[in-house]
A protein has these predicted regions:
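Structured alpha-helical bundle/scaffold domains in large eukaryotic membrane-trafficking regulators
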Residues: 56-63, 138, 173-180, 201, ...
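Extended amphipathic alpha-helical interaction segments
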Residues: 88-190, 194-198
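A cross-kingdom feature marking solvent-exposed beta-strand/loop segments within repeated
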Residues: 21-32, 144-148, 202-218
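N-terminal Sec/ER secretory leader and immediately downstream segment
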Residues: 1-87
Length: 237
């Protein structure tokens, strides 16, 4: 939970000029950061869904936590909205609800349920988003002028998943260790996501896959495709 809070706090307050996708002046010139933030947001949305639906519920008969319900609703607000209400105000309120849920965890009013089926549900959820990211990275109809949008969106998703899955590996260590190569596969997922984070070309090129000019979307897609494959393996362990 703290990881999700820290990720959103950084995008809302840690960056110079804060949230960019709804900035009608500065945002016009910072599309790389805009799309990176959108990627982080989408990963947070997917994670909040799983937190609400399974990770914090004993079973289907258990009630949803109201703070997680409100946080999810607020995270779903349009990222480009700059008034009535602004994206920043909605996301900050969502973060506040996550913080309220953390307090419930500390006082024992709520719990995490580290079951293997919850881990599989989370991994499948992440796999679905990454599959969509993969398709956008290999889309041959993407032009030179917007290829960087897809590149940085994918990096935002990968960054959020890297930070969250580092925590998941610790929390689900017992469940992963009980399956053959479970921990090794999770470590490899983290390694591939780290590779994505380390890709930072000065200019995003969009050459042909068999051309002499680089295609950075395709380069980014390689480790992300491996992550999707490894997530399929984890979900079947």
């Amino acid at each position: 939970m703290e990881t999700m809070i820290n990720l959103m706090d950084h995008e809302l307050h840690g960056r110079t000029l804060g949230w960019r996708p709804n900035d009608i002046v500065v945002g016009r010139f910072t599309d790389n950061i805009n799309n990176y933030q959108l990627g982080v947001l989408e990963a947070i949305r997917f994670t909040t869904v799983r937190l609400k639906d399974s990770l914090t519920r004993m079973g289907d008969a258990d009630t949803y936590d109201p703070d997680l319900e409100k946080a999810l609703h607020l995270f779903m607000n349009r990222a480009t909205s700059f008034y009535f209400p602004s994206a920043e105000s909605c996301y900050q309120e969502a973060v506040d609800h996550l913080k309220a849920f953390v307090e419930k965890l500390k006082t024992g009013k709520r719990s995490f349920y580290y079951r293997k089926d919850n881990l599989v549900a989370l991994i499948n959820n992440y796999k679905d988003l990454l599959g969509n990211v993969n398709r956008s990275l290999i889309d041959g109809n993407v032009g030179w002028w917007n290829s960087d949008d897809y590149f940085y969106y994918a990096k935002g998703v990968a960054h959020a998943y890297y930070e969250i899955l580092r925590v998941v590996r610790v929390g689900y260590q017992t469940q992963l260790a009980s399956t053959l190569y479970g921990l090794d596969i999770m470590d490899e997922i983290l390694h591939e996501l780290r590779r994505v984070e380390e890709m930072s070309p000065w200019i995003i090129l969009n050459g042909d896959l068999d051309g002499w000019i680089a295609n950075h979307r395709a380069n980014l897609n390689a480790p992300l495709s491996e992550v999707v494959h490894l997530m399929v393996v984890v979900s079947q362990l």
